[in-house]
């Protein structure tokens, strides 16, 4: 994992709407807080993104700007996750922006990686330390991190307003990339759209949106597919609960008069809303209930969408739910894997037995962690891979398996765990390694970051990630961890059990 101590020099780029000044350090140019859409405020927070207006003079792009209104997410229980959620909410209406890292040598032919951050549709930003794109730029890629609307402005179903405004933001950012990225040395005809968690759900949604056709040429989906997307009816349940908490009518005008602070605070009540009934239900890991709204989930529409024909890299982590369960004490003491499975399927006992057969040495805590993670991410990811492969697109599947010693070894290869290695992050970054952090105190394999980051770079450059494609004849899954092993038919029986449950 890498870092640099070089001194920065000022650099300028001319765009159709005005000039921006960034910085160059260690062979990498950096431009932060560059707007791709107009500022949003009042009722405009619930409208489609609008084009950027021009400015006079030179706009400072050396410091990251405002971020979408959001609650603090710097910790999950006992675990410090600040590298993925700092700086939190930086106030300001002008937060529909991108952060760009580009090689000094880029001449308009460099491949482009557009990355959409996660955070449960309610937190996070492109300015988080974890999403520094310098390592990609050092390897010849123009990296673009996207800020988009979160929470109610981004995803609440509001009569008279377009649904999925946060996704519309990302599509607008892709249009901006098509028109402007050449000025930063990138090739608009070689764009990979990537995302993790909620960001991966947005990627899946974009691949199924006809208005986005041609804006990306490859895609990466890390730990998210849209399997938990709301139907329009579920979106109405959440929206009604939200308006009731605020004590207002569910209209654009009424919501437009509510402050950002009040919108953020009201979102907390949704963490326990059961979208099937509207009643209260204990959430998994205090996950707030915002999601894209789709009449049919992306996995069910990808075969008929433009995204079904592009190259896709998709996967999950072995113990996704460890992030939500271990630091909050939900794996301490007696746990019930049947109850965990029952949150997702009716045939819970049959499903748990399939897991006991697959993992005969696992205890109840380990089974609960794995089943919950597969219910949240794994089963949906494999279903999306199957549908994408059937549509004719080239599909590559991975499973990240490296386990740190964090949370007394209960965290496992959890949600977020692959990100430090994908981004080849500085191992000494505050909050990343040590007691109470994601990576803990155990050292990963010395080449894990270079190999995993290198696989992502190779995919973005059009060479594939370095392992064979996932096909109907050989459902090959690349296991990535202490060892790298290409596994045919890996966990097919378990995911078939999900389909039957």
What do these predicted regions represent?
Residues 33, 79-252, 302-324, 463:
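Serine-hydrolase-like catalytic core of hydrolytic proteins
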Residues 49, 307-355, 404, 420, ...:
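C-terminal, loop-rich substrate-recognition/catalytic regions characterized by aromatic stacking residues
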Residues 29, 95-96, 168-171, 175, ...:
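A structural signal for well-ordered alpha-helical segments within the folded catalytic domains
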Residues 90-91, 163-166, 228, 232, ...:
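Aromatic-acidic/polar surface patches that form glycan- and anion
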Residues 346-391, 395-402:
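Alpha/beta-hydrolase fold catalytic core
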Residues 179, 213, 222-340, 368-373, ...:
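Substrate-access "cap/lid" subdomains that shape
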Residues 72-74, 378-501:
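Mobile gating loops/cap/lid regions near enzyme active sites that modulate substrate access
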Residues 1-164, 431-452, 458-466, 494-501:
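Non-catalytic accessory segments of hydrolases
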